[in-house]
From Swiss-Prot:
Record's protein name: Uncharacterized hydrolase C215.10
PANTHER family for this protein: HAD SUPERFAMILY HYDROLASE-LIKE, TYPE 3, PHOSPHOSERINE PHOSPHATASE
NCBIfam families the UniProt entry points to: Cof-subfamily, HAD-SF-IIB
A molecular function GO annotation: phosphatase activity
Residues forming coiled coils: none
GO annotation, cellular component aspect: cytosol; nucleus
A family per Pfam: Hydrolase_3
E.C. designation(s): 3.-.-.-
Family according to the record: Belongs to the HAD-like hydrolase superfamily.
Length: 302
C-alpha cells in the first residue's frame, strides 16, 4: 500500500473537540471550493450550522486571491463579519479595512520581469489590492493564464502598461506576482532564473501545479494568522486554531495552528504536514465532512 494512503488512514481521525477550537482558518481554492471553483453543498451546510450554533466562532478565509474575487463566497456564508487573508498573506482585512499589508519592492519587480521576459510559454501577472495586471502573456497568445484567473473570479486587466511606469516611483506597486504556465518545464525554468534572488528579498509559494507565486519574504498565510491573533483576537492562542488547506502555501499555517486538516485531494507536502486528513476530496465537500465529524452536525440539519 502506498505510503500516502497509509498516512491518510492514520490521520483521518486525528481531530479536535469543539471546545478546543476558538478560530478556524481555511484556504479557498481546492479546499473550501471544489474543482469547479464553487463551494460544495456539504461545505455550505456545515458553515451554516457553525454560523447558527457558534456565531462567535471566527471563520477566516485565507487565499491567494484578492478580496473582491471571494465577495460572493464571503457573503453567501455570512463571513463578512470576520477577518480575511488575501494574496497569500500579503494583505489582511478586518471588516473590509486593511490591518496588515506588504508589497514587493519595485526594484525587485523590475528585476523579476527582466529575468522572465523571454520564457516563451510563461505568462506573468502583477497583483495590487484591487486588480490583476498581465505583464507578459504566453507566446501563443491564447491567454491561458488570464482565462484561468478569470475563472477563479479575479479581475484581470489585459496589460500592465498603465502600471509599469509606476515601478519607477517611490510607492511599491505589486503585493505579489504570479507565474502561469501549462508547461511544467517553463515553470521550472522560471524558478531556476529566480533562484539567484536572495531569500531575504523574495519567497516563492505554490498552490497549483500550473502556477507559482512570488511574494515578500516575510509574508505568508502563517504570518497573517499571527497578525490576526495579535491585532484582532489577542485572547486566542495558536493552539486553539484549526487550519484547513490543500497546498504547499498552506503548510505555514499547519506549522503554527494547534490543529490542521489537509484535504485528501491536496498536494503531498500538505498531506504530510497536516495533523489530520479529510475522508473525502474537495469535490465531495471535504471541509464540510470534517466539520460534521468535529461538531456532530445532525444528518437532518439543513
Amino acid at each position: 500500500m502506498p505510503s500516502k494512503e497509509i498516512d491518510i488512514n492514520q490521520k483521518k481521525n486525528v481531530l479536535p473537540k469543539p471546545e478546543d477550537i476558538q478560530l478556524i482558518i481555511c484556504d479557498v481554492d481546492g479546499t473550501l471550493l471544489g474543482p469547479d471553483h464553487k463551494p460544495h453543498p456539504r461545505n455550505l451546510r456545515a458553515l451554516k450550522y457553525l454560523r447558527e450554533n457558534y456565531p462567535q466562532l471566527p471563520f477566516v478565509l485565507a487565499t491567494g486571491r484578492q478580496r473582491t474575487s471571494v465577495g460572493n463566497i464571503r457573503e453567501a456564508l455570512g463571513l463578512h463579519v470576520f477577518p480575511c487573508v488575501h494574496l497569500n498573506g500579503c494583505v489582511v482585512y478586518d471588516k473590509g479595512e486593511i490591518v496588515a499589508c506588504a508589497a514587493l519592492k519595485n526594484s525587485l519587480a523590475i528585476d523579476i520581469i527582466d529575468k522572465l521576459k523571454d520564457i516563451q510559454t510563461c505568462a506573468l501577472f502583477g497583483y495590487d489590492e484591487d486588480y490583476v495586471y498581465q505583464i507578459k502573456q504566453e507566446s501563443d497568445k491564447k491567454q491561458h493564464g488570464i482565462k484561468f484567473l478569470r475563472l477563479c473570479g479575479e479581475t484581470v486587466k489585459d496589460d500592465a502598461n498603465e502600471m509599469l511606469p509606476q515601478l519607477k516611483g517611490p510607492k511599491d506597486i505589486f503585493n505579489k506576482m504570479v507565474v502561469f504556465d501549462d508547461d511544467t518545464n517553463g515553470l521550472e525554468e522560471a524558478k531556476k532564473r529566480l533562484a539567484g534572488i536572495p531569500s531575504d528579498e523574495v519567497a516563492l509559494t505554490q498552490a497549483l501545479p500550473q502556477t507559482f507565486e512570488i511574494i515578500p519574504p516575510n509574508d505568508n498565510k502563517g504570518v497573517a494568522l499571527k497578525n490576526i491573533l495579535s491585532k484582532i483576537y489577542p485572547s486566542i492562542s495558536l493552539e486553539n486554531v484549526l487550519a484547513f488547506g490543500d497546498g504547499a502555501n498552506d503548510v505555514c499555517m499547519f506549522e503554527l495552528a494547534g490543529y490542521s486538516v489537509a484535504i485528501r485531494s491536496g498536494m503531498p507536502v500538505a498531506l504530510k504536514a497536516a495533523k489530520a486528513i479529510s475522508d473525502v476530496s474537495s469535490a465531495e465537500g471535504a471541509v464540510g465532512e470534517v466539520l460534521e465529524r468535529i461538531y456532530n452536525i445532525p444528518p437532518d440539519f439543513n
